[in-house]
Amino acid sequence: MEKHYHWLGRSGGYGVGYGAPASVGAALANRDLGRFSVSIQSDGDLMYAPGVLWTAAKHKIPLLAVMHNNRGYHQEVMHIQRLSNFRNRLPNMDGDMGPVGTSIERPDIEYHKLAESMGWWAKGPIKDPAQLGPALKEAIAVVKSGQPALLNVWTQPR
């Protein structure tokens, strides 16, 4: 990255609610400088602080949030698997790999509807990659007009 503002960076809180508030804060800082802000927002992370969507809409903070909706807290899954491998044991009490971690499905969260209910322009769920380009074009126009936009993009669960 050539400029310090091209990338928000990492925090020890990544995956536990850091992403959305940090992105809205960065977009607020960028707003008066005319910089276009994009957040690749994970679904589990947003669930820690969904009220930040209202804050961005209320204060007209232009931000393009592209939801990486894999329907799970997969940082948790990867951590459990990593620790299990390190300790040479399987990650559940039944002695097989079985399900680990927390999925966010049944019911699936309609992030685009959540964002719309808080004043965002939103579209989704986007499940077909061919739909992503046109949706991005629409969302970019909305953000350039000074409003936040969210695309609920379904990705492959890990």
Segments the model singles out, each with a brief description of its role:
Residues M1-P157:
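Thiamine diphosphate
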